[in-house]
A protein has these predicted regions:
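Helical scaffold of the NTase/Pol beta-like nucleotidyltransferase catalytic core
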Residues: 1-35
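Membrane-proximal basic amphipathic "stem/tether" segments
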Residues: 1-5, 133-213
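Metal-dependent nucleotidyltransferase catalytic core
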Residues: 14-17, 58-97
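Active-site nucleotide-donor binding segment shared across nucleotidyl transfer reactions
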Residues: 22-55, 59-65, 224, 251-252
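Cytochrome P450 catalytic domain signature, combining two hallmark sequence patches
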Residues: 74-79, 254-262
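Internal, conserved structured core segments that host functional sites
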Residues: 82-148
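Extended, basic/helix-rich recognition subdomains
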Residues: 186, 198-257
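Residue-level detector of conserved catalytic or cofactor/ligand-binding positions
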Residues: 272-279
């Protein structure tokens, strides 16, 4: 399904989810900052980038862990926190605040039925030495790749293709093992990621990084950039960005005020089913 066909309704829904997340965090004294394209949207467009299709936030690890605990005990009404700890089909190691009155399947290869969502990325303390922080990112990425591999559902035909060539027998064996032992392997990988995420004391750390982010080494940056945050108008509400947002955004994107070429202004999610109306 093409998001452009339902863009107005889509944006209204994810904006409502963002407002719900804000209310939850204000009620419990938690902090988050808009990040990536959402942060650019706040500065450059004062709202969702016209061709963007999601909202992303980062949350300091201590607050993120508290949010996970709060979600176990508190009813968020029509919203739910989707995490890798309570949904075996969920293939990611960050969380989403999801609207239960909506439905989507984000990927065909790793299908997980949830509602429309806001992505919540944990922001972890990391090594003060940048090179060591980068090596930690590399190690973490390898674990994520393994989690992705065991979460991918292959069709029968794809399995047979692997079996018919001696060059792919090894991959067939790994896929078969993953099929029968997926839950155990998944739990082990998540424990490894949990361990790495808590290696350093967040309060004492000089640098932080989003291990689950997709911008490579750029995900490592000085914690002092966050500060107390800076408020920006965002559609019909306001959002918080890192206090030194200009340094933060230039670190990730260079001249972020420059519009990308027209051919790059496209939605990025691979969606196979969408239902955004309340039943």
């Amino acid at each position: 399904m093409d998001i452009k066909d339902i863009k107005k309704e889509w944006n209204a829904k994810i904006l409502d989810i963002l407002k719900a997340l804000t209310r939850i965090c204000e009620d419990h004294g938690l902090t988050f900052y808009c990040c990536a394209g959402t942060a650019i949207g706040a500065v450059r467009h004062h709202g969702i980038i016209p061709w963007d299709d999601d909202i992303d936030v980062i949350m300091p690890r201590p607050d993120y862990d508290r949010l996970l605990e709060i979600a176990k005990k508190e009813d968020f009404g029509k919203y739910e926190l989707v995490t890798p700890y309570d949904n075996e089909a969920y293939p990611l190691y960050f969380s989403k605040l999801s609207d239960k009155t909506t439905t989507l399947v984000e990927e065909r290869e790793r299908p997980c039925v949830i509602g429309l969502f806001v992505d919540i990325f944990p922001l972890d303390a990391t090594d003060d030495d940048i090179d060591k922080a980068h090596r930690l990112k590399d190690r973490y990425t390898k674990i994520i790749n393994r989690l992705n591999a065991i979460s991918t559902r292959n069709t029968f035909g794809e399995y047979m293709q692997l079996l018919t060539s001696t060059k792919t027998w090894g991959r067939f064996a790994i896929k078969t093992l993953a099929f029968f032992c997926r839950s155990a392997i998944r739990r082990r990988l998540i424990r490894q990621m949990d361990g790495m995420s808590h290696l350093y004391d967040y309060e004492k750390a000089k640098n932080v990084q989003v291990y689950t982010g997709s911008y490579g080494y750029r995900e490592v940056f000085p914690k002092e950039w966050l500060g107390k945050g800076k408020t920006f108008p965002f559609e019909d509400t306001t959002v918080l960005l890192p206090e030194r947002y200009d340094e933060y955004l230039r670190h990730f994107f260079g001249d972020y005020m420059q519009l990308p070429p027209v051919e790059q202004r496209i939605e990025k999610h691979n969606l196979s089913l969408i239902h955004i109306s309340e039943p």
